[in-house]
Design a protein with these regions (language model features):
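Membrane-embedded alpha-helical segments of multi-pass transporters/permeases
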Residues: 118-122, 206-211, 267-271, 371-375, ...
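Hydrophobic transmembrane-helix bundles of small-molecule transporters
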Residues: 187-298, 305, 331
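Glycine/proline-centered helix-kink
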Residues: 145, 166, 171, 175-183, ...
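12-transmembrane solute porter fold
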Residues: 35-59, 68-94, 103, 110-111, ...
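Membrane-embedded alpha-helical segments in integral membrane proteins
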Residues: 58, 62, 115-122, 172-187, ...
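Cytosolic juxtamembrane N-terminal segment immediately preceding the first transmembrane helix
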Residues: 1-52
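Helix-terminus/helix-capping segments at the ends of transmembrane helices and short amphipathic helices
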Residues: 62-65, 132, 151-156, 161, ...
């Protein structure tokens, strides 16, 4: 039975995760009155910490593997295990946020991330470090769905686009600071101290959100977990990504192929299996909604390119001692800083020329930038041209991230925790697979050019996906309704 449609959501939101998204005081979402931007600050700090931990070990990775006496391809697990855990756990974390309350789970998740970050800094060997990176990812899996959900609760549609632009900027800032911070700290005092800044900011985020009454702290809504759907989605996502991660490590192709096949079978059974459930974890008809699907595919492609580039470029620059880790981190800095500065501008551009045009422009620019990196990887190192290519890649990512996130939150699927978890799962699955792809191309003779070419192909595939389906209906009179990926 379908509920009545809401002004900013399409009918059917109740069929995801077992409940409808509950407006927080306004018929179109948003708190009563006109809340300022202060409640957003601790949420952005939490977003920053989660993103920072994703790539803080990229630049000093060679120092890490030398310290732990493992190969670079094995050490790449340290990088990709974090987004793998995020991608697997986010849909379930989003569902749980709806059940126990987004604010409560946000604070708990940030504190857990601080604890597991301290554990990672004390890891005695590669196995322990990878395990703590997985725990870091699981701890932070709820942060992004909670933040996006709280933004929709706090801000009405007229201001939600700008809030999501700031959210995208916080994501970019974490990507900006991660490589140079990791390289600088590791070169100065050792790689085990790279998590200390994130712990400090995380404690501030948890304290700020917990103390601010303007951050909605409702108890959540009781709902039953549809175990079959949750298990299929979690197992399918995890097995597909894990199989890609294991390619350079497990030299038995049949093992990897079996894991991948089982993962694909789980996802196919979830998507196409016929089973009447009163409260499905994810209704396949809804998560195939065009607006949500193209936003998720665009975000996946963008993060695949980002994960590939932020891992491959530092390794390329530090090969055979070409550059120190700190210097490599500063070169890579040009990509995320561009992404951070232009994220709010992308929201304005979407309002003026339309979100799908911005998405298409961003993915096209990103594909060209990856091809430029491929060309440079096969020639004599030209740092100025490399920096220009990274800046162009940052421009492309900025033009994708904000409209894709806004489009996901506006769709019926994206108005509940499970849907927000699915969207962010797609993002970090892209990041994990991008890092895994780099491990594959470096497993034997390094083939950096091939790594960037495949990233360009992923961006091109995302571009093709933006032509699927009609535009979503927009609420008249709301400029924010235009700044979406719909």
């Amino acid at each position: 039975m379908r509920p009545e449609p809401e002004p900013e959501a399409e009918p059917g939101a109740a069929a995801i995760g077992g409940r409808r998204a509950a407006p927080a005081g306004r018929p179109d979402g948003g708190l009563p009155g006109r809340p300022g931007w202060a409640p957003l600050v601790p949420l952005l700090c939490g977003t920053f910490v989660g993103t920072l931990n994703n790539n803080v070990l990229n630049a000093p990775l060679r120092l890490v593997v030398a310290s732990l006496r493992v190969s670079v391809s094995s050490g790449a697990l340290v990088v990709v295990s974090y987004p793998l855990a995020l991608a697997v756990a986010m849909p379930l974390a989003g569902w749980y946020a709806d059940r126990v309350g987004r604010k409560r789970l946000f604070v708990a998740s940030v504190l857990a991330l601080c604890v597991t970050s301290a554990g990672a800094s004390l890891a005695p060997d590669i196995a322990a470090l990878v395990a703590f990176r997985v725990l870091q990812g699981l701890s932070s899996a709820a942060i992004l769905p909670c933040v996006m959900g709280l933004i929709t609760e706090i801000y009405e549609p007229g201001r939600r686009g700008r809030a999501l632009g700031l959210w995208a900027a916080a994501n970019g800032l974490g990507q900006t600071v991660g490589p140079p911070l990791g390289g600088l700290v590791a070169s100065s005092v050792g790689w085990r101290f790279v998590f200390v800044p994130a712990i400090a900011v995380g404690l501030v985020a948890a304290a700020g959100a917990g103390a601010d009454r303007r951050v909605p702290g409702g108890p959540g809504h009781r709902s039953r977990l549809e175990v079959r759907g949750a298990a299929l989605l979690t197992a399918g996502t995890g097995l597909v990504i894990a199989s890609a991660m294991l390619v350079p490590i497990v030299h038995v192709a049949s093992v990897v192929a079996i894991l991948a096949a089982v993962g694909v079978a789980c996802l196919a059974l979830l998507a196409f299996g016929r089973r009447e459930v009163r409260e499905p974890f994810v209704d396949p008809q809804l998560w195939r909604e065009p607006s949500f699907l193209r936003s998720s595919l665009a975000a996946f492609a963008q993060m695949f390119c980002l994960g590939t580039t932020l891992l491959a470029v530092p390794l390329y620059l530090t090969r055979s001692g070409s550059l120190a880790p700190a210097s490599a981190g500063l070169v890579v800095f040009s990509l995320p800083v561009t992404m951070t500065l232009l994220a709010p501008v992308a929201g304005v551009a979407a309002e003026r020329v339309g979100p799908r045009r911005v998405l298409r422009s961003g993915l096209g620019v990103l594909a060209l930038a990856e091809l430029a990196l491929a060309a440079l990887a096969g020639s004599t190192l030209e740092l100025p041209l490399l920096v220009v290519s990274l800046v162009v890649a940052g421009l492309g990512i900025a033009l994708v991230q904000t409209p894709a996130a806004a489009g996901a939150t506006r769709s019926a699927v994206g108005r509940v925790g499970t849907g927000l978890g699915l969207f962010n799962s797609a993002r970090f699955a892209g990041s994990a697979l991008g890092g895994a792809w780099v491990a594959v191309v470096l497993a034997h003779a390094p083939r950096y050019r091939l790594g960037f070419v495949v990233a360009a192909a992923a961006a091109a595939a995302g571009l093709v996906a933006t032509f699927a389906g009609p535009d979503s209906p927009r609420t008249s009179g709301s400029r924010a309704a235009v700044s979406t990926g719909g």
